[in-house]
Amino acid sequence: MFRGLAQTMGFGSYVAACAEVSVSDAGELTVHRIVAATDPGHAVNPQQIEAQVEGSFVYGLSAALYGEITLKDGRIEQSNFHDYPVLHMDEMPAVEAIVMPSGGFWGGVGEPTIAVAAPAVLNAIFAATGQRIRELPLKHHSLKKA
């Protein structure tokens, strides 16, 4: 099990994430768990913030693993969610969302979480394989150890 960290400040909130991943000898990636700490300034409904953080990881991880827009004959091939790949429930890692309101500025909770998903996973992949990946989606990369 390898870990990667990422943090950002955006939309008035601070977010840090730790991704735990493993990479098999065949180069198959498994994201086991993500822990995210969010400071949105104020937390009127902490359970709603936790749910928003969890949902944002679905979007952020989907983009990191699969997300791309492809063209064929001058047209975009993806027209809606039925033909745009997203993370399936059985691929979703455990997510632990920690809400840490500081009493500061009222910030967003979904958008900044999306921004730490890919960097946390990529840093964990680097810890596991020694590879620095600079282009997404991950589905185009061999993750065999360097």
Model-inferred region functions:
Residues 1-146:
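Cofactor-binding beta-sheet edge motifs in enzyme active sites
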